[in-house]
Protein backbone atom coordinates (compact mmCIF):
# COMPACT_ATOMS: atom_id res chain seq x y z
CA UNK A 1 0.00 0.00 0.00
CA UNK A 2 3.07 2.28 0.19
CA UNK A 3 1.90 3.93 3.38
CA UNK A 4 -1.57 4.72 2.09
CA UNK A 5 -4.84 2.86 1.71
CA UNK A 6 -5.78 1.82 -1.82
CA UNK A 7 -2.65 3.40 -3.32
CA UNK A 8 -3.21 1.55 -6.61
CA UNK A 9 -6.25 3.72 -7.25
CA UNK A 10 -4.02 6.72 -7.98
CA UNK A 11 -2.78 4.91 -11.07
CA UNK A 12 -6.34 4.17 -12.15
CA UNK A 13 -7.25 7.82 -11.75
CA UNK A 14 -4.17 8.73 -13.78
CA UNK A 15 -5.28 6.49 -16.66
CA UNK A 16 -8.82 7.88 -16.52
CA UNK A 17 -7.59 11.49 -16.50
CA UNK A 18 -5.27 10.96 -19.47
CA UNK A 19 -8.23 9.53 -21.39
CA UNK A 20 -10.43 12.51 -20.52
CA UNK A 21 -7.80 15.10 -21.49
CA UNK A 22 -7.11 13.37 -24.81
CA UNK A 23 -10.83 13.19 -25.56
CA UNK A 24 -11.39 16.86 -24.80
CA UNK A 25 -8.33 18.09 -26.69
CA UNK A 26 -8.25 15.69 -29.65
CA UNK A 27 -11.21 13.35 -30.03
CA UNK A 28 -9.65 11.64 -33.02
CA UNK A 29 -6.96 10.10 -30.81
CA UNK A 30 -9.34 8.63 -28.23
CA UNK A 31 -13.00 8.94 -29.31
CA UNK A 32 -14.21 7.07 -26.23
CA UNK A 33 -12.04 8.91 -23.74
CA UNK A 34 -15.14 10.28 -22.02
CA UNK A 35 -15.47 6.85 -20.39
CA UNK A 36 -12.69 7.96 -18.06
CA UNK A 37 -15.37 9.96 -16.25
CA UNK A 38 -17.12 6.72 -15.30
CA UNK A 39 -13.88 5.30 -13.93
CA UNK A 40 -13.62 8.42 -11.76
CA UNK A 41 -17.23 8.09 -10.65
CA UNK A 42 -16.75 4.47 -9.58
CA UNK A 43 -13.54 5.23 -7.68
CA UNK A 44 -15.14 8.25 -6.00
CA UNK A 45 -18.18 6.27 -4.87
CA UNK A 46 -15.94 3.53 -3.52
CA UNK A 47 -13.59 5.87 -1.65
CA UNK A 48 -16.20 8.13 -0.06
CA UNK A 49 -18.35 5.24 1.23
CA UNK A 50 -15.24 3.36 2.41
CA UNK A 51 -14.23 6.45 4.37
CA UNK A 52 -17.67 6.83 5.95
CA UNK A 53 -17.94 3.15 6.88
CA UNK A 54 -14.43 3.09 8.29
CA UNK A 55 -15.29 6.03 10.52
CA UNK A 56 -18.55 4.41 11.63
CA UNK A 57 -16.78 1.12 12.25
CA UNK A 58 -14.35 2.95 14.55
CA UNK A 59 -17.29 4.18 16.63
CA UNK A 60 -17.04 7.85 15.60
CA UNK A 61 -20.28 8.00 13.64
CA UNK A 62 -20.72 9.82 10.36
CA UNK A 63 -19.51 13.14 11.75
CA UNK A 64 -21.83 15.28 9.66
CA UNK A 65 -20.16 18.63 10.24
CA UNK A 66 -16.65 17.31 9.77
CA UNK A 67 -17.68 15.38 6.66
CA UNK A 68 -19.24 18.34 4.85
CA UNK A 69 -16.47 20.72 5.96
CA UNK A 70 -13.84 18.34 4.61
CA UNK A 71 -15.60 18.09 1.26
CA UNK A 72 -15.96 21.89 1.16
CA UNK A 73 -12.26 22.39 1.86
CA UNK A 74 -11.33 19.86 -0.79
CA UNK A 75 -13.48 21.24 -3.60
CA UNK A 76 -13.69 25.02 -3.31
CA UNK A 77 -10.11 26.33 -2.93
CA UNK A 78 -9.16 25.23 -6.45
CA UNK A 79 -12.44 26.58 -7.82
CA UNK A 80 -11.87 29.95 -6.19
CA UNK A 81 -8.52 30.12 -7.99
CA UNK A 82 -9.66 28.66 -11.32
CA UNK A 83 -12.67 30.89 -11.92
CA UNK A 84 -11.15 34.39 -11.61
CA UNK A 85 -7.87 33.52 -13.33
CA UNK A 86 -9.45 31.93 -16.40
CA UNK A 87 -12.15 34.60 -16.64
CA UNK A 88 -9.51 37.34 -16.55
CA UNK A 89 -7.46 35.56 -19.22
CA UNK A 90 -10.51 35.14 -21.44
CA UNK A 91 -11.26 38.88 -21.19
CA UNK A 92 -7.93 39.66 -22.85
CA UNK A 93 -7.79 36.72 -25.26
CA UNK A 94 -11.33 36.09 -26.55
CA UNK A 95 -14.35 37.72 -24.94
CA UNK A 96 -16.71 35.43 -26.82
CA UNK A 97 -15.76 32.82 -24.20
CA UNK A 98 -17.47 34.95 -21.55
CA UNK A 99 -20.96 34.70 -23.05
CA UNK A 100 -23.25 33.43 -20.27
CA UNK A 101 -20.34 33.36 -17.81
CA UNK A 102 -22.35 34.79 -14.91
CA UNK A 103 -24.77 31.86 -14.83
CA UNK A 104 -21.94 29.40 -15.36
CA UNK A 105 -20.01 30.69 -12.34
CA UNK A 106 -23.07 30.78 -10.12
CA UNK A 107 -24.18 27.24 -10.95
CA UNK A 108 -20.63 25.86 -10.71
CA UNK A 109 -20.25 27.27 -7.20
CA UNK A 110 -23.68 25.95 -6.21
CA UNK A 111 -22.88 22.50 -7.59
CA UNK A 112 -25.74 22.41 -10.10
CA UNK A 113 -24.07 23.37 -13.38
CA UNK A 114 -25.16 20.09 -14.98
CA UNK A 115 -28.83 20.99 -14.59
CA UNK A 116 -28.21 24.54 -15.81
CA UNK A 117 -26.50 23.18 -18.92
CA UNK A 118 -29.43 20.83 -19.56
CA UNK A 119 -32.05 23.55 -19.12
CA UNK A 120 -30.16 26.09 -21.24
CA UNK A 121 -29.59 23.67 -24.10
CA UNK A 122 -25.81 23.56 -23.79
CA UNK A 123 -24.49 20.44 -25.48
CA UNK A 124 -21.55 18.51 -24.09
CA UNK A 125 -20.76 17.21 -27.56
CA UNK A 126 -20.87 20.60 -29.33
CA UNK A 127 -17.57 22.09 -30.46
CA UNK A 128 -18.63 25.59 -31.58
CA UNK A 129 -18.02 28.09 -28.77
CA UNK A 130 -18.50 25.67 -25.82
CA UNK A 131 -18.99 26.97 -22.27
CA UNK A 132 -15.75 27.80 -20.48
CA UNK A 133 -16.80 25.65 -17.52
CA UNK A 134 -18.65 22.97 -19.45
CA UNK A 135 -16.45 20.25 -17.92
CA UNK A 136 -17.80 21.18 -14.48
CA UNK A 137 -20.92 19.09 -15.07
CA UNK A 138 -18.81 16.22 -13.70
CA UNK A 139 -18.02 18.06 -10.47
CA UNK A 140 -21.68 19.05 -10.09
CA UNK A 141 -22.81 15.41 -10.25
CA UNK A 142 -20.07 14.51 -7.79
CA UNK A 143 -20.98 17.33 -5.39
CA UNK A 144 -24.63 16.27 -5.42
CA UNK A 145 -23.57 12.70 -4.66
CA UNK A 146 -21.34 13.91 -1.80
CA UNK A 147 -24.32 15.78 -0.42
CA UNK A 148 -26.62 12.75 -0.48
CA UNK A 149 -24.38 9.79 0.25
CA UNK A 150 -24.00 10.25 4.05
CA UNK A 151 -27.79 10.46 4.29
CA UNK A 152 -28.07 7.23 2.29
CA UNK A 153 -25.47 5.54 4.51
CA UNK A 154 -27.28 6.68 7.66
CA UNK A 155 -30.60 5.29 6.40
CA UNK A 156 -29.11 2.01 5.15
CA UNK A 157 -27.44 1.37 8.49
CA UNK A 158 -30.96 0.84 9.87
CA UNK A 159 -31.52 -2.13 7.54
CA UNK A 160 -32.83 -5.35 9.05
CA UNK A 161 -30.39 -7.50 7.09
CA UNK A 162 -26.75 -6.57 6.73
CA UNK A 163 -26.63 -7.28 2.96
CA UNK A 164 -29.68 -5.13 2.15
CA UNK A 165 -27.55 -1.96 1.72
CA UNK A 166 -25.45 -3.69 -0.93
CA UNK A 167 -28.58 -4.75 -2.82
CA UNK A 168 -30.12 -1.28 -2.52
CA UNK A 169 -26.99 0.50 -3.74
CA UNK A 170 -26.59 -1.96 -6.59
CA UNK A 171 -30.27 -1.45 -7.43
CA UNK A 172 -29.74 2.32 -7.58
CA UNK A 173 -26.83 1.77 -9.98
CA UNK A 174 -28.94 -0.47 -12.22
CA UNK A 175 -31.85 1.99 -12.18
CA UNK A 176 -29.53 4.82 -13.19
CA UNK A 177 -28.13 2.78 -16.09
CA UNK A 178 -31.61 1.74 -17.25
CA UNK A 179 -32.83 5.31 -16.99
CA UNK A 180 -29.98 6.48 -19.22
CA UNK A 181 -30.68 3.82 -21.83
CA UNK A 182 -34.46 4.24 -21.85
CA UNK A 183 -34.50 8.04 -21.89
CA UNK A 184 -32.08 8.28 -24.78
CA UNK A 185 -33.35 8.32 -28.35
CA UNK A 186 -31.00 8.06 -31.31
CA UNK A 187 -32.15 11.35 -32.85
CA UNK A 188 -31.77 13.26 -29.57
CA UNK A 189 -28.79 15.13 -28.19
CA UNK A 190 -27.44 12.82 -25.43
CA UNK A 191 -26.62 15.76 -23.14
CA UNK A 192 -29.69 15.22 -20.92
CA UNK A 193 -28.85 11.63 -20.09
CA UNK A 194 -25.12 12.29 -19.95
CA UNK A 195 -25.28 15.32 -17.63
CA UNK A 196 -28.18 14.14 -15.47
CA UNK A 197 -27.40 13.21 -11.88
CA UNK A 198 -30.17 10.62 -12.08
CA UNK A 199 -29.09 8.99 -15.34
CA UNK A 200 -25.30 9.14 -15.01
CA UNK A 201 -24.75 7.84 -11.50
CA UNK A 202 -24.24 4.13 -12.06
CA UNK A 203 -20.52 4.28 -11.31
CA UNK A 204 -21.03 6.23 -8.09
CA UNK A 205 -23.59 3.81 -6.67
CA UNK A 206 -21.73 0.73 -7.92
CA UNK A 207 -18.53 1.90 -6.23
CA UNK A 208 -20.50 2.56 -3.05
CA UNK A 209 -22.02 -0.94 -3.17
CA UNK A 210 -18.59 -2.53 -3.56
CA UNK A 211 -17.25 -0.54 -0.59
CA UNK A 212 -20.15 -1.76 1.57
CA UNK A 213 -19.62 -5.35 0.43
CA UNK A 214 -15.97 -5.14 1.49
CA UNK A 215 -17.02 -3.95 4.93
CA UNK A 216 -19.39 -6.90 5.28
CA UNK A 217 -16.63 -9.29 4.26
CA UNK A 218 -14.45 -7.83 6.99
CA UNK A 219 -17.16 -8.39 9.58
CA UNK A 220 -17.88 -11.85 8.20
CA UNK A 221 -14.27 -12.83 8.80
CA UNK A 222 -14.35 -12.21 12.52
CA UNK A 223 -14.23 -8.43 12.28
CA UNK A 224 -10.69 -8.41 10.94
CA UNK A 225 -8.83 -5.25 10.06
CA UNK A 226 -8.78 -3.91 6.53
CA UNK A 227 -5.16 -4.99 6.19
CA UNK A 228 -5.93 -8.55 7.29
CA UNK A 229 -8.88 -8.73 4.93
CA UNK A 230 -6.72 -7.64 1.99
CA UNK A 231 -4.16 -10.30 2.94
CA UNK A 232 -6.86 -12.99 3.00
CA UNK A 233 -8.32 -11.85 -0.31
CA UNK A 234 -4.88 -11.93 -1.90
CA UNK A 235 -4.20 -15.39 -0.48
CA UNK A 236 -7.45 -16.74 -1.94
CA UNK A 237 -7.70 -14.76 -5.16
CA UNK A 238 -4.07 -13.70 -5.58
CA UNK A 239 -3.81 -15.01 -9.13
CA UNK A 240 -7.31 -14.52 -10.44
CA UNK A 241 -7.90 -10.97 -9.14
CA UNK A 242 -4.98 -9.21 -10.85
CA UNK A 243 -5.56 -11.11 -14.09
CA UNK A 244 -9.25 -10.14 -14.08
CA UNK A 245 -8.28 -6.53 -13.38
CA UNK A 246 -5.75 -6.53 -16.21
CA UNK A 247 -8.30 -7.94 -18.65
CA UNK A 248 -10.79 -5.30 -17.46
CA UNK A 249 -8.19 -2.59 -18.09
CA UNK A 250 -7.55 -3.86 -21.62
CA UNK A 251 -11.29 -3.98 -22.31
CA UNK A 252 -11.69 -0.44 -21.00
CA UNK A 253 -8.84 0.87 -23.15
CA UNK A 254 -10.29 -0.91 -26.19
CA UNK A 255 -13.67 0.76 -25.65
CA UNK A 256 -12.01 4.16 -25.24
CA UNK A 257 -10.23 3.69 -28.56
CA UNK A 258 -13.05 2.23 -30.63
CA UNK A 259 -16.40 3.33 -29.16
CA UNK A 260 -17.31 6.95 -29.75
CA UNK A 261 -20.42 9.03 -29.17
CA UNK A 262 -23.79 7.54 -29.95
CA UNK A 263 -26.32 4.93 -28.91
CA UNK A 264 -23.67 2.28 -28.25
CA UNK A 265 -21.91 4.41 -25.66
CA UNK A 266 -25.11 5.55 -23.93
CA UNK A 267 -26.76 2.13 -23.76
CA UNK A 268 -23.75 -0.11 -23.33
CA UNK A 269 -20.31 1.45 -22.95
CA UNK A 270 -20.95 3.67 -19.92
CA UNK A 271 -22.51 0.85 -17.87
CA UNK A 272 -19.74 -1.51 -18.99
CA UNK A 273 -17.04 1.00 -18.03
CA UNK A 274 -18.53 1.34 -14.55
CA UNK A 275 -18.64 -2.43 -14.09
CA UNK A 276 -15.11 -2.89 -15.39
CA UNK A 277 -13.95 -0.18 -12.99
CA UNK A 278 -15.21 -2.23 -10.04
CA UNK A 279 -13.21 -5.21 -11.32
CA UNK A 280 -10.17 -2.95 -11.65
CA UNK A 281 -10.57 -1.71 -8.08
CA UNK A 282 -11.03 -5.24 -6.73
CA UNK A 283 -7.93 -6.50 -8.49
CA UNK A 284 -5.65 -3.60 -7.63
CA UNK A 285 -6.26 -2.90 -3.93
CA UNK A 286 -5.11 -6.20 -2.29
CA UNK A 287 -1.60 -6.24 -0.84
CA UNK A 288 0.90 -8.07 -3.01
CA UNK A 289 -1.19 -7.74 -6.18
CA UNK A 290 1.06 -7.34 -9.22
CA UNK A 291 -1.68 -5.17 -10.69
CA UNK A 292 -1.18 -2.76 -7.81
CA UNK A 293 2.55 -2.77 -8.48
CA UNK A 294 1.79 -1.87 -12.09
CA UNK A 295 -0.50 1.00 -11.12
CA UNK A 296 1.92 2.60 -8.66
CA UNK A 297 4.13 3.56 -11.61
CA UNK A 298 5.26 6.94 -10.35
CA UNK A 299 4.31 9.28 -13.24
CA UNK A 300 0.89 7.64 -13.52
CA UNK A 301 0.30 7.79 -9.77
CA UNK A 302 1.36 11.46 -9.66
CA UNK A 303 -1.18 12.35 -12.33
CA UNK A 304 -3.85 10.51 -10.36
CA UNK A 305 -2.86 12.16 -7.09
CA UNK A 306 -3.29 15.64 -8.56
CA UNK A 307 -6.15 14.65 -10.83
CA UNK A 308 -8.62 17.14 -9.37
CA UNK A 309 -6.53 20.20 -10.18
CA UNK A 310 -5.53 18.85 -13.58
CA UNK A 311 -9.15 18.18 -14.47
CA UNK A 312 -10.26 21.65 -13.41
CA UNK A 313 -7.61 23.55 -15.36
CA UNK A 314 -7.19 21.58 -18.58
CA UNK A 315 -10.48 22.48 -20.29
CA UNK A 316 -10.52 26.31 -19.98
CA UNK A 317 -6.79 26.42 -20.74
CA UNK A 318 -7.36 24.36 -23.88
CA UNK A 319 -10.05 26.81 -25.01
CA UNK A 320 -7.69 29.72 -24.37
CA UNK A 321 -4.82 28.09 -26.26
CA UNK A 322 -7.13 27.47 -29.23
CA UNK A 323 -8.14 31.13 -29.16
CA UNK A 324 -4.51 32.31 -29.09
CA UNK A 325 -3.42 29.98 -31.91
CA UNK A 326 -6.48 29.57 -34.17
CA UNK A 327 -4.22 28.88 -37.16
CA UNK A 328 -3.18 25.54 -35.67
CA UNK A 329 -6.67 24.09 -35.93
CA UNK A 330 -7.17 20.35 -36.29
CA UNK A 331 -4.05 19.97 -38.42
CA UNK A 332 -1.75 20.84 -35.52
CA UNK A 333 -3.89 19.56 -32.66
CA UNK A 334 -0.78 17.99 -31.14
CA UNK A 335 0.72 21.45 -30.64
CA UNK A 336 -2.42 22.68 -28.93
CA UNK A 337 -2.40 19.60 -26.72
CA UNK A 338 1.28 20.04 -25.80
CA UNK A 339 0.85 23.69 -24.80
CA UNK A 340 -2.34 22.87 -22.89
CA UNK A 341 -0.72 20.04 -20.94
CA UNK A 342 2.26 22.22 -20.03
CA UNK A 343 0.11 25.11 -18.82
CA UNK A 344 -2.20 22.73 -16.97
CA UNK A 345 0.71 21.21 -15.07
CA UNK A 346 1.98 24.66 -14.07
CA UNK A 347 -1.40 25.97 -12.92
CA UNK A 348 -2.35 22.72 -11.15
CA UNK A 349 0.89 22.74 -9.14
CA UNK A 350 0.55 26.43 -8.23
CA UNK A 351 -3.09 25.90 -7.27
CA UNK A 352 -2.12 22.99 -5.03
CA UNK A 353 0.72 24.88 -3.34
CA UNK A 354 -1.00 28.24 -2.87
CA UNK A 355 -4.64 27.27 -2.31
CA UNK A 356 -5.55 23.60 -1.95
CA UNK A 357 -2.86 22.33 0.42
CA UNK A 358 -3.02 25.27 2.90
CA UNK A 359 -6.82 25.07 3.12
CA UNK A 360 -6.79 21.27 3.49
CA UNK A 361 -4.39 21.60 6.42
CA UNK A 362 -5.66 24.65 8.28
CA UNK A 363 -8.89 25.85 6.68
CA UNK A 364 -9.58 28.93 4.58
CA UNK A 365 -7.90 31.18 7.14
CA UNK A 366 -4.61 29.70 5.92
CA UNK A 367 -5.00 31.69 2.69
CA UNK A 368 -4.50 34.98 4.52
CA UNK A 369 -2.48 33.86 7.54
CA UNK A 370 0.90 32.14 7.36
CA UNK A 371 1.95 29.31 9.60
CA UNK A 372 3.11 29.82 13.16
CA UNK A 373 6.69 30.72 12.25
CA UNK A 374 6.69 33.77 10.03
CA UNK A 375 9.82 33.33 7.95
CA UNK A 376 10.57 34.75 4.54
CA UNK A 377 9.03 31.80 2.67
CA UNK A 378 5.76 32.03 4.60
CA UNK A 379 5.64 35.78 4.14
CA UNK A 380 6.25 35.46 0.43
CA UNK A 381 3.52 32.85 0.08
CA UNK A 382 1.12 35.01 2.09
CA UNK A 383 1.60 38.13 0.02
CA UNK A 384 1.64 36.21 -3.26
CA UNK A 385 -1.66 34.55 -2.37
CA UNK A 386 -3.30 37.78 -1.23
CA UNK A 387 -2.10 39.61 -4.34
CA UNK A 388 -3.30 36.88 -6.71
CA UNK A 389 -6.71 36.61 -5.02
CA UNK A 390 -7.28 40.37 -4.85
CA UNK A 391 -6.23 41.17 -8.40
CA UNK A 392 -7.88 38.24 -10.12
CA UNK A 393 -11.19 38.43 -8.30
CA UNK A 394 -11.39 42.20 -8.77
CA UNK A 395 -10.75 42.02 -12.48
CA UNK A 396 -12.89 38.90 -12.89
CA UNK A 397 -15.78 40.79 -11.31
CA UNK A 398 -15.32 43.56 -13.86
CA UNK A 399 -15.12 41.04 -16.71
CA UNK A 400 -18.28 39.25 -15.58
CA UNK A 401 -20.17 42.54 -15.22
CA UNK A 402 -19.17 43.59 -18.75
CA UNK A 403 -19.29 40.19 -20.44
CA UNK A 404 -20.94 40.16 -23.87
CA UNK A 405 -24.46 38.82 -24.15
CA UNK A 406 -23.68 37.02 -27.40
CA UNK A 407 -20.67 36.06 -29.49
CA UNK A 408 -19.22 38.31 -32.17
CA UNK A 409 -20.33 35.89 -34.89
CA UNK A 410 -23.90 35.89 -33.60
CA UNK A 411 -23.91 39.69 -33.40
CA UNK A 412 -22.66 39.95 -36.99
CA UNK A 413 -25.23 37.45 -38.28
CA UNK A 414 -28.09 39.25 -36.56
CA UNK A 415 -26.89 42.61 -37.94
CA UNK A 416 -26.83 41.15 -41.46
CA UNK A 417 -30.32 39.71 -40.97
CA UNK A 418 -31.65 43.12 -39.88
CA UNK A 419 -30.03 44.79 -42.88
CA UNK A 420 -31.61 42.29 -45.27
CA UNK A 421 -34.98 42.80 -43.61
CA UNK A 422 -34.72 46.57 -44.03
CA UNK A 423 -33.71 46.10 -47.67
CA UNK A 424 -36.76 43.90 -48.30
CA UNK A 425 -39.08 46.51 -46.79
CA UNK A 426 -37.46 49.22 -48.90
CA UNK A 427 -37.86 47.14 -52.05
CA UNK A 428 -41.55 46.58 -51.29
CA UNK A 429 -42.19 50.29 -50.72
CA UNK A 430 -40.31 51.32 -53.88
CA UNK A 431 -42.00 48.77 -56.09
CA UNK A 432 -43.36 50.40 -59.30
CA UNK A 433 -44.89 49.11 -62.50
CA UNK A 434 -42.31 48.41 -65.16
CA UNK A 435 -43.53 48.54 -68.82
CA UNK A 436 -43.48 45.23 -70.57
CA UNK A 437 -40.96 45.15 -73.42
CA UNK A 438 -42.29 44.73 -76.96
CA UNK A 439 -42.14 41.31 -78.48
CA UNK A 440 -39.22 41.22 -80.93
CA UNK A 441 -40.06 40.78 -84.63
CA UNK A 442 -37.76 38.42 -86.51
CA UNK A 443 -37.45 38.89 -90.34
CA UNK A 444 -35.90 36.54 -92.86
CA UNK A 445 -32.60 37.88 -94.23
CA UNK A 446 -32.41 38.43 -98.01
CA UNK A 447 -30.08 36.57 -100.37
CA UNK A 448 -27.53 39.36 -100.65
CA UNK A 449 -27.05 39.04 -96.85
CA UNK A 450 -26.02 35.39 -97.17
CA UNK A 451 -22.96 33.50 -98.34
CA UNK A 452 -23.07 29.77 -99.09
CA UNK A 453 -19.91 27.72 -98.58
CA UNK A 454 -19.72 23.98 -99.11
CA UNK A 455 -18.61 21.04 -101.18
CA UNK A 456 -20.24 19.06 -103.99
CA UNK A 457 -23.53 18.92 -102.09
CA UNK A 458 -23.65 22.70 -101.96
CA UNK A 459 -22.71 22.90 -105.63
CA UNK A 460 -25.54 20.55 -106.58
CA UNK A 461 -27.99 22.73 -104.62
CA UNK A 462 -26.76 26.06 -106.01
CA UNK A 463 -29.46 26.43 -108.68
CA UNK A 464 -32.30 25.92 -106.23
CA UNK A 465 -30.71 28.30 -103.71
CA UNK A 466 -30.31 31.03 -106.31
CA UNK A 467 -33.98 30.75 -107.27
CA UNK A 468 -35.13 30.95 -103.64
CA UNK A 469 -32.57 33.46 -102.36
CA UNK A 470 -31.76 35.91 -105.12
CA UNK A 471 -28.22 37.33 -105.10
CA UNK A 472 -26.94 34.72 -102.64
Residue ranges: model-predicted function:
Residues 465-468:
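Short Gly/aromatic-enriched secondary-structure transition segments
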Residues 2-9, 15-398:
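Hydrophobic membrane-embedded alpha-helices
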Residues 362-451:
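N-terminal secretory targeting modules
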Amino acid sequence: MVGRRFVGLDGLKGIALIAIVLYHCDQGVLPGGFLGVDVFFTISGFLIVSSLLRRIDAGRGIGWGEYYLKRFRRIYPALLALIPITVAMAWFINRDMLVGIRNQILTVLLGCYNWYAISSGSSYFAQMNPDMFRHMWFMSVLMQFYLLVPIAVYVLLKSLHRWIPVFVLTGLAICSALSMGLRYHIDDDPTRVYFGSDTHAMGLWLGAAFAWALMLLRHGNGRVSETQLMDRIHARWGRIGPIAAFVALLALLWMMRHIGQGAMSVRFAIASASTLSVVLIAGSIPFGSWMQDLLVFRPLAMIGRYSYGIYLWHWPLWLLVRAVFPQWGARYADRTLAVTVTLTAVFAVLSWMLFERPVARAGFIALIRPTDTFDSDNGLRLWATVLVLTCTWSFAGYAVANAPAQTGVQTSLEANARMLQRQRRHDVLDRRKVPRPKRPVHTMPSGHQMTAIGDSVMLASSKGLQLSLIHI
